[in-house]
Curated annotation (Swiss-Prot):
This is Copper-transporting ATPase. The active site is at residue 627. The lineage of its organism: Eukaryota, Fungi, Dikarya, Ascomycota, Saccharomycotina. Cu(+) 2 binds at residues 91, 94. Interacts with the copper chaperone ATX1 via the copper anion. It comes from Saccharomyces cerevisiae (strain ATCC 204508 / S288c) (Baker's yeast).
Amino acid sequence: MREVILAVHGMTCSACTNTINTQLRALKGVTKCDISLVTNECQVTYDNEVTADSIKEIIEDCGFDCEILRDSEITAISTKEGLLSVQGMTCGSCVSTVTKQVEGIEGVESVVVSLVTEECHVIYEPSKTTLETAREMIEDCGFDSNIIMDGNGNADMTEKTVILKVTKAFEDESPLILSSVSERFQFLLDLGVKSIEISDDMHTLTIKYCCNELGIRDLLRHLERTGYKFTVFSNLDNTTQLRLLSKEDEIRFWKKNSIKSTLLAIICMLLYMIVPMMWPTIVQDRIFPYKETSFVRGLFYRDILGVILASYIQFSVGFYFYKAAWASLKHGSGTMDTLVCVSTTCAYTFSVFSLVHNMFHPSSTGKLPRIVFDTSIMIISYISIGKYLETLAKSQTSTALSKLIQLTPSVCSIISDVERNETKEIPIELLQVNDIVEIKPGMKIPADGIITRGESEIDESLMTGESILVPKKTGFPVIAGSVNGPGHFYFRTTTVGEETKLANIIKVMKEAQLSKAPIQGYADYLASIFVPGILILAVLTFFIWCFILNISANPPVAFTANTKADNFFICLQTATSVVIVACPCALGLATPTAIMVGTGVGAQNGVLIKGGEVLEKFNSITTFVFDKTGTLTTGFMVVKKFLKDSNWVGNVDEDEVLACIKATESISDHPVSKAIIRYCDGLNCNKALNAVVLESEYVLGKGIVSKCQVNGNTYDICIGNEALILEDALKKSGFINSNVDQGNTVSYVSVNGHVFGLFEINDEVKHDSYATVQYLQRNGYETYMITGDNNSAAKRVAREVGISFENVYSDVSPTGKCDLVKKIQDKEGNNKVAVVGDGINDAPALALSDLGIAISTGTEIAIEAADIVILCGNDLNTNSLRGLANAIDISLKTFKRIKLNLFWALCYNIFMIPIAMGVLIPWGITLPPMLAGLAMAFSSVSVVLSSLMLKKWTPPDIESHGISDFKSKFSIGNFWSRLFSTRAIAGEQDIESQAGLMSNEEVL
């Protein structure tokens, strides 16, 4: 499978995107097609039955200019791995039954079932089976089962693909020599290169390589041996992306057309409107150009000038509309260009017909013929001006994305010789992992990494939304795209290119434009039938008024003062107004422009929103479920003290045990593990000891079990909660945690099967957690907390943030979190639940919830499972929950703006089309085509300007007032649902055991 990304120019509304989508999906070999009207990008997935060039031709056949930005192969994932819970197994026979039955499923490659953890790990081929099939098979065996995790299996995360442009082209070689060209690259296969592919046009080389063995600069250096020169084709070509987002070409095109058509329109208006109205004697006295020509009777100089000017505008500036209209009609669809083309052609053709008719049948009184060249020119002029303003406004909707792209520098300085401290400047595309990069004051940081030398203050507003300089020193992480302050430092790169956090943010924002809100489906449907419907209405309008004039003894005032020819003209003019006043673009732009601005504002304030569907989901959320550690609390846990069991009688070296504890905890990335490691690092006694982990097992929901060796001694180490440290062992030891401060987390340690002691660990609540939770409650949301921590710790945090104890669940496993989320969803019939977590052990619950919200810190984003990612910093000041309030406010206001845009677009068409059809003609009110064109041009502009109003968004004051004024104050449906709603009450029993080294106390 391959994926091609194309830039498509000339799309104006959803009818254009629907036309392209329909044609591409009908093409054999195309499996997926996504089009963004705002970013002008088309992303197509296809197989070997079609080529990128043929896809480009299809788009061009639809009447749009198109260029290929990137064409690359998609790495196929042959297998996936999944994790299922299996409840009810009692012995090895149960394990054997489950293993045998699941292994018998076609496509399953490996099955491992654990009786202790009650889990089943499956590796399977997604092309042949699914994890759901395995779950059903387990349940058929008589056991309860749930899917915990379903992710990639053998996808090699170290494998990278690079596309190189050949500057010394292969076509210079003869076919005989060309066959040996491929052989020149074979030596690369021994250096870490997985595959080499030469493009059909011989201009590009696609290489897959292992980035652990080979860097991009190393690859280019080896390629020099072939005798050819290469440059890296960057997927993040900033210049191309910025050019597309700024719409420079479109702005330039419509600006030129607007100037030309407006200048000529002014001349035509002088000839046909202003002079006859202001100085009628000039027309009556037949002063030039209102004088009849001497060589053709009935032909006036005014009309010669008019037909020349109108023909130029109609077939020069208007050629764009003809081309687009013909392309859409070829595929059985219509766009706004079709309506413009039909209306201007009607006015132009009528004028030419009147001119020719007057030449063959001149008036005996020398009366000037009825000519409306000014109408066709003015319509094109108004539309061109409207398009120019609309494109300008649309370019402003993507400023947030443009600013993020601009944060990536084009070059950077790396240490080329460590001993001599020599630096060299390289393009950012050539940056490799583990490079040492020099950052001077004011420079942009090119990659994610860790500071190795020096210190500074850095602007990380792309993460937090606040331009507060964050102090950084040796060992602190830095993020690509952040801007250095006054200091000078060096850092080692950890992720580069498309794997950086900035690249992920840009990717999420761009993909958000491809995700349509369900409400947009209605707009797309209306747009698909809009043009045919308007043309039918225009024809009906013409014939109905002609019929009324023929049978009516008392025609409307607009017709009584005119001849039959004039009445025919008014009927035609009325029908033309119907065609030109209709505006499908307003409907098509209502949703995507608001989504682009809303997601851009969110990104600027540390909130990543994954498209329109997420925005619509947020509008129906009634309940928020919080994780505790890392979400309501800072996640920076600290060991307050270590209590050794007074009954311990084992003959072991305590320093060696602490060294083994540190080595064991190094396996996990859990906040509790990090706290214990820091505590062990602070003890001088074990710094000289080097413990080696021989075996280890992470027991989900309970802790870690390992076998360690230090100084030739072997220890069986077990660290975790009471469920892991067998209750019998605790009872035998007589060791209880009565001396532990209530509200702290407890992690027990056993050595060689006997309880050794416990760690008492504390985690502080975030400084704005209380204000955020109260903000939600003030605005009618139900709040819950589900944690794997013990009862006392859960109560302490709930008390501090203001969550009712009846809505708090403790000692809950990841699977248990899913069960509780389902339980809360089922309350009151249709409860919509948003889960807020930090991504550690939360992925299943985030995926199961109606809306998953991940709190992201550090340099990794929990993007996959969450619908919304809230970015925050690592330090206590920027590690904030306030972003949740921002996410709610932005999402609700953006969705409200979408509905307002659609309401305005529908009201405009519903109101203006009947007026254009002549419902007010009995009262002498008509809508001339020129005014209709002006109204239509500015209707779409007004929708874009409405979306741009979202840029004025300011963060809500969570300390005082909330969002009820725009969420539901004026919603009748919400009023009645709240009036008869009841408060959700927690169940009597919590679900037990959660991942993470926690003690297992009484259930709330």
